[in-house]
């Protein structure tokens, strides 16, 4: 039986309790920055964590959540965390490449996970714990993985087959793997901050994007995209991280209580993610502004065959051993088309 990452952290912390120093300044303030709206799965989970942190510490900790890039933009937030200007983040996994750690881009490989249960074999098991542990050499404490969901493509023209992608400028997160993925479709990747995606689509600077449905809806991308094709081609998730020096200097009891709050928030985040995405898709349909297309089995197979070329091309960049470990954990066969 696998021990989850959160349980492992709790067991470690149980051995280090010490009373709160008499001169400790309370409440301890934690700035938690993220780039999406409060009504997304991540936004709701961050607020839930703040609530549980206050309750479990009996007011000794106050988590101030800054959503929608109000404190730091995509490209700045990880550096701000390392400098201690902010104490916690939940960046998408691709952004951790900014730390010089490419292994997290394994989650960007297309069609790697058949479903969320298969994904959780990685994020909730030994491999997920190992990946988060690699952040510590960069002054970052990895605490948990939060789901958003599986992505679909959008554009202002129907995307029913491989030729329909040709020449499109598609917004991605900064990620070598995502760049390679988009090029397998004959499209052009355009790495842009999430906060600027709507405007870039509205002005025609880019032609399309890839997002889970909750992002399409909460960012009102349906207003500037006429078509969404339900591909479920890739996963978008987040790492909940903290400044390591800040985390290590917390009293042991506070660390234990915050780890418990993170565990509860993780269960909450992952529970609501699929619900939120399903509801968002129905809300997009209800606007009547965007047509939703479901690929046929043959169309999906064509797209999958093209995109799977990303695996062999990018495995050396990610780290072949990490890619192989994920294959083994999930039962994925890269040779099965």
How does the language model describe each region?
Residues 24-118, 126-129, 133-337:
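N-terminal secretory/targeting leader peptides
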Residues 4, 20-22:
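Short, low-complexity interaction segments enriched in Ser/Thr/Pro/Gly
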Residues 1-7:
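Positively charged n-region of N-terminal signal peptides that target proteins for export
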Residues 18-19, 214:
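Solvent-exposed, well-ordered amphipathic alpha-helical segments
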Residues 7-18:
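Bacterial N-terminal signal peptides
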